Structures are given as structure tokens and as C-alpha cells.
Amino acid sequence: MPFRTMLFAPGDHARKVEKVFDAGADAVILDLEDAVAVSQKPATRALVREALQRPRPNLGYARVNGIETPFCYGDLAALVGPGLDGVILPKVETPDQLKTIDWLIAQLEAERGLPAG
């Protein structure tokens, strides 16, 4: 489904996360990376997961932390599930990094009984 508008919002601001899906964008991207302090990353994952699981009129994506960080796996493990339409992966430097993330998402989907993709 093509979309014209994307709205990014920091995933650690409960009020913004609550309202962003009603702003009229075709897709919403909740940011877990640069906008979130290290100490807030676990709580942000939970907030974003809950927001993505609610009914909404648009696509819901998460911008996770880069594969070279210690946070990427935790982000994916927390978020791959119902309601997540896709992942925005920052700072990809090689095709192998993208293949690794694709493989990891596929494994999490299979473990959780979700359809691939």
C-alpha cells in the first residue's frame, strides 16, 4: 500500500504517542533511537508496543536502534508482533546488516506464530 505522508514521533513521550495516530498521516513512525535516552529505552519499548497493538487508521512502524548498538535486538524482540507494520533500520552500512535484521525478524515471527512479512 503506497503512502504519501509519514509522521515521525519520539516513542518515549506518552502524550505524543497517544495522539500521533490521529494526526492524519498515512504512516506513523515511532522512534526508539536518537530521540530516546538510554535509561528510557526499556520503558519506551513497552509504550511503543502497546501503541502499535491498538486499532488505528494508519500504518505503524518503529525506528529501532541500529544493528551495531546493544539495543537493536531488544527493540525487535519487544516489538515484533501484532500491529507492527514494519521497521525503520537506521545506519545500515552493508547488505549483510540488512539480511541479518531480516533473518532475525523472520525468526521472531516464526517463534510467535505470525505470518512472514
Segments and roles (model prediction):
Residues 1-117:
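Expand to "…catalyze enediolate/carbanion chemistry for C-C bond making/breaking, isomerization
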